Design a protein with these regions (language model features):
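Long, charged amphipathic helices and adjacent flexible linkers at domain junctions
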Residues: 47-63, 325-332, 465-480
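Conserved pre-motif I regulatory segment
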Residues: 56-85
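ASCE P-loop NTPase helicase motor core
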Residues: 74-77, 82-256
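Conserved helicase motor core of P-loop NTPases
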Residues: 75, 192, 200-363, 373, ...
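C-terminal accessory regions
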Residues: 247, 355-359, 366-483
Length: 483
């Protein structure tokens, strides 16, 4: 209690009665939450200019794209013309991408400047490919930089220097934490439309807050929830399995040759790891023509015989062994080798990178995945390609990297892979939950293989326990709490 009093006196924390509970916030979180509430309220109160003739233009878009929107899809596109703030949700196969394409087309035909963004580089790249328009990370869109002396993150785009956009569309919004949402809202000029797209059944953001869920559950923001699975998507066992898990049911585990979903029962951990290695090294590349680089192994945990650490050791030895003229550098328990798939494990705003076209910048972020291109003969400089950016690391910066042949489901959020192998094995109770299994399944685009035991799968599907997030945003929005 004395420690709390000291923090209150110093202004490090803020106490406030929130929904009949005595809340205690870090000051920065309290400021972010109240700011988000204030901006959202302002957007809800502000009636934007109706986009006249929108319905006629939507008809033209349907004809041009050779489609007919389902009723809820059309509702989403029409609401985008009417609302300053719109939420669009839906699971796999429900037509979110088609709806977003329609919203983009409508905005552009009405002469609006539209920006697309997502929380991670992979999610932004995927969004851009699906929408046929460049998408950026939210960090890059806002011009994020880091003050080395104060440790503060700043953004060049803010209230004083807002984004030059009439509309901003955000994908994978469930991953956006409170601080990043605060920064995004601050960068929107008055009247700018904001469309938040995502799947609320995936895991929440790593950082503080549950912004997407709070906005939906406040029932103050116009929301379209796409529910129906389209016939074409319904043919995918991946899509069907995701929706079964979301309903608390176990996926169908009977394998058929024409399926995009397979279950390989393995109870013994040694045999399980051997199976994963065999799938990545030979079976999928040779039988299904899926190269190892397009396969991502996912698991719930880092620890244990079937955690990411053990899987990465086995996969590195099989897919990128020592020798063959590949230089390597040992750091701690890991050996980094030319050709290895690696992942950044923390935000580093100082890492310099360059693209082939000569553009350069700084910053590699938590969860970014790359490939080691070259280790110089001294072992002191390492070149790593993160998609289209090549970054140079010094040897001491290897502390920020981990192997990425296998990764936790949490780290895979916002990404999509041609093939996913999910390791189903006992883990800590907090990880044996439906959200982890659902998120793992929905990372797969063409092929999903579950390897492990059906008991663990059943426990995960049945366990709807969610990580509790203490937040006052829903209360502030829904009950008129003070901002």
């Amino acid at each position: 209690e004395k420690a709390l009093d000291d923090l209150l006196e110093r202004g490090s924390v803020v106490q406030e009665q929130v929904a009949n509970v005595e809340g205690c916030y870090l000051r920065r979180c309290h400021e972010a939450e109240t700011y988000v509430c204030t901006r959202v309220r302002a957007m809800l109160a502000d009636k934007p200019d109706k986009l006249r003739g929108a319905k006629k233009i939507i008809d033209e878009i349907e004809r041009a794209q050779g489609i007919e929107y389902a009723p809820l899809q059309r509702q989403a596109v029409e609401l985008a013309a009417q609302e300053e703030l719109l939420i669009l949700t839906g699971g796999p196969g429900t037509g979110k991408t088609t709806s977003v394409r329609g919203i983009v087309a409508l905005f552009e035909r009405m002469g609006l400047d539209v920006l697309l963004c997502a929380p991670t580089g992979r999610a932004a790249k995927r969004m851009g490919e699906l929408c046929g328009k460049e998408a950026q990370t939210i960090h890059r869109l806002l011009g994020m930089s880091w003050n080395e002396q104060t440790g503060d993150v700043t953004f060049t785009k803010n209230e004083k220097e807002p984004l030059e956009a009439d509309a901003v569309i955000v994908d994978e919004t469930s991953m956006v934490d409170l601080a990043l949402m605060r920064a995004l809202l601050a960068a929107l000029r008055p009247g700018c439309r904001l469309v938040l797209v995502g799947d609320p059944d995936q895991l929440p953001s790593v950082g503080a807050g549950n912004v997407f869920g709070d906005l939906i559950r406040s029932e103050r923001v116009a929301t379209v929830a796409l529910k129906d699975i389209f016939r074409q998507a319904e043919q995918s066992a991946i899509v069907r399995s995701a929706h079964l898990v979301n309903e608390g049911r176990l996926p169908e585990l009977q394998n058929t040759a024409a399926s995009d979903f397979f279950f390989l029962p393995r109870r013994d951990s040694v045999r399980l790891v051997d199976t994963v290695v065999e799938l990545c090294r030979t079976r999928l590349p040779e039988k299904m023509h899926i190269p190892a680089e397009s396969i991502q192994v996912l698991t719930a945990t880092r620890k244990g015989d079937t955690g990411t650490a053990a899987l990465n050791r086995a996969l590195q030895a099989a897919l990128n062994p020592a020798g063959a003229g590949r230089r390597e550098k040992r750091f701690g328990d890991l050996v980094f080798r030319e050709g290895d798939r690696v992942m950044q494990t923390r935000n580093d705003y100082d890492v310099l990178w360059e693209r082939e076209d000569g553009t350069a910048g700084a910053g590699i972020f938590n969860g970014d995945v790359g490939k080691i291109l070259q280790i110089d003969p001294s072992g002191e400089l390492i070149s790593i390609a993160f998609d289209d950016r090549v970054a140079t690391y010094t040897a001491d910066m290897l502390a920020e990297l981990d192997m990425a042949y296998a990764m936790t489901v949490h780290k895979a959020q916002g990404s999509e892979y041609r093939a996913v192998i999910f390791v189903s094995a006992p883990a800590a109770p907090g990880l044996m939950v439906r959200g982890v299994l659902y998120t793992a399944i929905t990372r797969a685009r063409e092929l999903l293989i579950l390897v492990g035991d059906d008991v663990s799968l059943g426990k995960m599907a049945a366990n709807d326990r969610r990580t509790r997030r203490y937040s006052g945003l829903r209360w502030r929005l829904g009950n008129g709490g003070t901002a």
